[in-house]
Regions:
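Active-site PLP attachment segment
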Residues: 117-153, 166, 259
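Helix C-cap/helix->beta junction micro-motif
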Residues: 27, 58, 90-91, 242, ...
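Active-site phosphate-binding strand-loop segment of PLP-dependent enzymes
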Residues: 38-106
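PLP-dependent enzyme catalytic core of the Aspartate aminotransferase-like
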Residues: 11, 53, 237-245, 252-290
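Phosphate-binding glycine-rich loop
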Residues: 1-9, 228
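Substrate-binding/gating loop at the entrance of the active-site cleft, primarily
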Residues: 1, 12-31
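Structural signature of PLP-dependent enzymes
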Residues: 153-159, 176-199, 231
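Conserved glycine-rich beta-strand-loop-beta hairpin in the small C-terminal domain of fold type I
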Residues: 174, 191-199, 211-224
Length: 290
């Protein structure tokens, strides 16, 4: 609402977190999409030619960038980020970099913020929060880093009406960052082991499924299109046929997501195993009937 007028557009990479689309729709702004390129091993890459073509649209005003990317789990390399940044700067666009998953990366890796490669670009806004890292979404607390002084002042005025910080949320966030380090490292190790468990299960029980272990997030992005080619609504199928609630498909992830499901692996491994076994049984039953 603050950055875009009614005839201007925002750009998303797809698949995309659905609430990026919802935010644009709420503000009455049209959306451009640039599909990520899918590779045979399940990984994704930026289609730089398409991305630049969309940025060059005279109506494009803002890029929603997700780093690390949700739902694919990509941690963009410094080279990728620099190429994206160069395109954004060439067309003088605003960029909102959603980095909420930046703490939830595989052990031994290091997050590269967009701010590192756009060190002096004034139209960068970075969004982070303790809520994913420490499972504190109920705090409704986040860190919004706005470089442009005029925009920051406008945001602060708007914040007086819609975003007053709860003192308890602020205290909880400070405590999490100050004292949660050891817990956070143990969490990352457990998540890494969960991803390895799911990867091995799928390779053994559902070899048609395509999944790679993402560099970041606690979310597995799994291609089940070869397992269930005739099922159009995978979340509905698994809810009703397996008793498993999950997310997937274009309805939530905007586009470029047909045949995919997103699995939350931030839970005890025994629960993950039960869910996977239910999914396997439902898939095998569906395959046998068709």
């Amino acid at each position: 609402e603050t950055l875009c007028g009614p005839d201007e557009k925002v750009l998303l990479n797809t698949p995309a977190y659905g609430y990026f689309l919802h935010a644009a729709e709420y503000a009455g702004v049209d959306v451009l999409t640039s599909p990520l390129h899918k590779k045979a091993d399940g990984t994704f890459a930026v289609d730089f030619e398409d991305f630049e073509r969309k940025c060059a649209d005279p109506a494009c005003k803002l890029v929603f960038w997700c780093n690390p990317h949700n739902p694919t789990g990509r941690m963009w390399t410094e080279d990728e980020l620099r190429r994206v940044a160069a395109i954004i700067e060439e067309y003088n666009l605003w960029v909102v970099s959603d980095e909420i998953h930046c703490d939830l990366i595989r052990c031994g890796r290091r997050h590269i913020p967009m701010a590192k490669v756009m060190d002096s670009y004034p139209k960068l806004i970075t969004c982070m929060a303790p809520t994913k890292t420490f499972n504190m979404a109920g705090l409704a607390f986040s860190n919004i880093i706005i470089r442009d002084p005029a925009l920051r002042a406008r945001y602060q005025e708007r914040d007086k009406l819609f975003g007053m910080v709860n003192p308890m949320s602020l205290t909880a966030a400070q405590a999490a960052y100050a004292h949660g380090g050891a817990w956070h490292e143990a969490l990352k190790q457990y998540l890494d082991e969960n991803f390895a468990f799911v990867k091995a299960f799928l390779a053994r029980e559902l070899p048609e499924a395509v999944m790679y272990i993402p560099e970041a997030t606690y979310l597995a992005w799994v291609d089940l299109s070869r397992c269930l080619p005739d099922v159009s609504d995978l979340p509905d199928f698994f809810a009703n046929k397996a008793g498993v609630l999950l997310e997937g498909g274009d309805s939530l992830f905007v586009g470029n997501a047909k045949g995919y499901v997103r699995l939350n692996l931030a839970m005890p491994r025994a629960i993950i195993q039960t869910g996977l076994e239910r999914m396997r049984d439902a898939i095998r039953k569906e395959q046998a009937e068709h």
